[in-house]
């Protein structure tokens, strides 16, 4: 390489270096919010968050490179949830991911006009989050819990596990706006099975002992709720103490000693939420993105608890289980 060529090459390199730096600096970093309705990080939360991050990475969104996730742990206080949603909007964030009906409502009300990606919404149409699943028509879209199918199946599975069952209580947080939908969905299935359902509403944690005692002599269905999840160990202890077979909407109860859980796949909800984030960050409007419903459901059975309750789980039910605790 002669001197003239070397000088030309060096000059070209000097010109290219600033261009490369500017190109690197031009990468836009998006900030999104995540509102979670509890104050503690559970083992299941870690799995769910990893599913979200994996889904985002698969779509090209990498934390620290082109994405920042602002997580707010909101507990179960709706007012605090609204305040945190407003805080996220002020940062600002491009959108808020919100888990569960009460938190979704808080995100909508606390950050009006901001896109909200719903995760596992109980009844998004009935709660007036969206006009329809196919055409949401507002600032909210995301995943629905397929509540009617899941809740009806919980009733059916409980009746299979306890064939002589005639009555079951349904434990609900009276603050949850989707309760009417939940109870109606379960009642329809219970009627075909010859079961009587009793709605058991609680408002505060101090009412749990008396509420679960009302289910004695029958069984119990515990509807998903952040307050219940936070008190899952106590709730499970109460069901065992009262000798009440129970089914839950989260595997964390079964890990704590509950009899059974049946739910749509949490991993599916969180990974699918990533696809909604991707579309909105790329310019799509929530109003035009259809709400998605799950196709994968998971059954978990605690055989140690079944033995303690004196229940023999039918082989047909064991064969359907995704996980057995022995």
Language-model segments: residues:
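Short hydrophobic alpha-helices and adjacent helix-cap/hinge residues
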Residues: 1-326
């Amino acid at each position: 390489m002669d001197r003239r060529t070397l000088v030309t090459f060096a000059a070209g390199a000097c010109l290219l270096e600033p261009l490369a730096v500017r190109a690197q600096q031009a990468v836009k970093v998006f900030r999104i919010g995540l509102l979670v309705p509890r104050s503690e990080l559970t083992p299941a939360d870690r799995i769910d968050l990893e599913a979200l991050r994996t889904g985002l990475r698969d779509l090209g969104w990498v934390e620290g490179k082109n994405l920042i996730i602002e997580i707010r742990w909101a507990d179960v206080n709706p007012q605090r949830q609204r305040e945190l949603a407003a805080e996220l909007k002020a940062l600002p964030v491009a959108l808020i991911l919100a888990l569960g009906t009460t938190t979704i409502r808080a995100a909508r009300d606390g950050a009006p006009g901001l896109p909200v990606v719903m995760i596992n919404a109980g009844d998004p149409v009935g709660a007036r989050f969206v006009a329809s699943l196919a055409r949401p028509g507002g600032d909210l879209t995301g995943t629905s819990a397929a509540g009617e199918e899941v809740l009806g199946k919980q009733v059916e599975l409980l009746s299979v596990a306890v064939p002589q069952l005639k009555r079951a209580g349904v434990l609900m947080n009276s603050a949850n706006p989707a309760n009417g939908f939940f109870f109606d969905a379960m009642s329809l299935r219970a009627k075909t099975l010859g079961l009587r359902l009793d709605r058991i509403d609680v408002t505060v944690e101090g009412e749990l002992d008396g509420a679960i005692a009302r289910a004695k002599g029958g069984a119990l269905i515990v509807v998903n709720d952040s307050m219940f999840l936070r008190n899952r160990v106590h709730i499970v202890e109460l069901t065992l103490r009262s000798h009440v077979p129970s089914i839950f909407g989260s595997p964390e109860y079964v890990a704590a000693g509950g009899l059974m859980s049946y739910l749509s796949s949490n991993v599916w909800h969180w990974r699918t939420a990533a696809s909604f984030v991707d579309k909105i960050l790329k310019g799509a409007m929530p109003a035009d993105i259809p709400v998605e419903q799950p196709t994968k459901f998971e059954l978990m059975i605690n055989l140690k608890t079944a033995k303690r309750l004196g229940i023999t789980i039918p082989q047909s039910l064991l064969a359907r289980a995704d996980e057995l605790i022995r």
